[in-house]
Amino acid sequence: MNPEPHVRHRRALPVLAPLALLALLTASAWAQAGTPKPGTVFKDCEKDCPEMVVLPTGSFMMGTPDDEVGRQADEGPLHKVTFTKPFAISRFPITFAEWDAFIQATGYMMPSGDERPGRLCQAGTATQGGRPTYGGNYPVTSRHPAVCMNLKEAQDYVAWLSNKTGKPYRLPSESVREYAARAGSTGPFPFPFDEGKEYSIAKHANTYGPADGYSYTAPVGSFPANAFGVYDMHGNIYEWTADCKHDNYVGAPSDGSPWQEKDCRFQSIRGNDYGEAPVFSRSGNRNDLYPNERGDWIGFRVVRDL
C-alpha cells in the first residue's frame, strides 16, 4: 500500500472577481496574428491539443499575509515574482480526451496505483485504451479532468505534447500556478463567498459537499473562469507542479521559474479536489505529494512558452 499523501487542512476567506475570454486561434491563424494578446485562446493542433490562454506579463506578491484565515507557515514570506516573458496556460486541467490521445499514441498502459476507497486507480486494459478504471460511479467522459497519473507520467505527457506540436510545453511552477489562480486578485479567492454562506464557494468551485452539484469531479469548465480566462483553479482536482516542496519561500525564485532540488522527496501540488473543504482552495494554499503517488483526485495542466 502506498504511503498516505502529505495532505494538510486549511481555511479560507473572500475577495472579488471578474471573468474573461476571447478568440480561439489555431496555430496557423496565430502565426498571421503575430504576438498574441493576453486573453487570446489558441490550440497548437486542431485535434487532441489542449486549449491555451495567454496570460499577461507582470508582477504579483506570492504567498499569503499573516492574518489570512487558514494560513500556514509554508505560505510565507510574501515575495514579489515578476514574469517578463509572455506565456500561456491551459484553460482547463488536461482532459480524458487529451490524455487518451497520449495513451493511444504511445501505447502506454497505466499501472494500478492507489486502491484505497475514494482514491481508487486500477490498471487499465487494452480494450480500455490503457485508461485506469475507477470505483463507484466515477465519471470518465472526454470532458472530465484526467486523473491517476503520477508525476513522471504527467512529465511524459508534456514531452509527448512538445514533440507532437514542436512547441515548448512544461508543467507550471508553483508561482505560475498561483499567478494564474489569483488573476490579479490579492485575497484568498478571486471571487466572493456564496451569498450569506461563510466559507462556501459552491458557485465557483467543486469542493467537498453536494452544494456545488457534484460528488466526484465535474466536467472541466463547469464553473466560471477567472479574470485571466482560466478555469477550475480552486477545486475539482489537485494538480502537479514542477516544484519540489519547500517549507517556506525563503530563497524562492523571483522570476517564475520552477524551484527544484536534486533529491526531492515531496512534489508541490496546487488547487483542491472534489472531496476537500473550501479552505484548501485559497489561491495561496500549498500542498505536496509523493512523486509516485496516484489518486482519482490528482491531475495536471500545462504551460506553453511564447
Language-model region placement:
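N-terminal secretory signal peptides that target proteins for export/translocation
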Residues: 1-10
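Short, structured beta-strand segments at or near domain termini in extracellular proteins/domains
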Residues: 296-306
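N-terminal low-complexity, Pro/Thr/Ser-rich intrinsically disordered segments
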Residues: 34-44
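Surface-exposed intrinsically disordered loops and tails
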Residues: 120, 125-132
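Functional-site microenvironments in short loops/helix caps that host divalent-cation chemistry
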Residues: 61, 65-71, 109, 114-115, ...
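Boundary at the C-terminal end of the N-terminal hydrophobic targeting segment
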Residues: 29-33
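Bacterial N-terminal signal peptides
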Residues: 16-27
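A short glycine-rich, aromatic-capped structural motif
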Residues: 43-122, 149-152, 235, 242
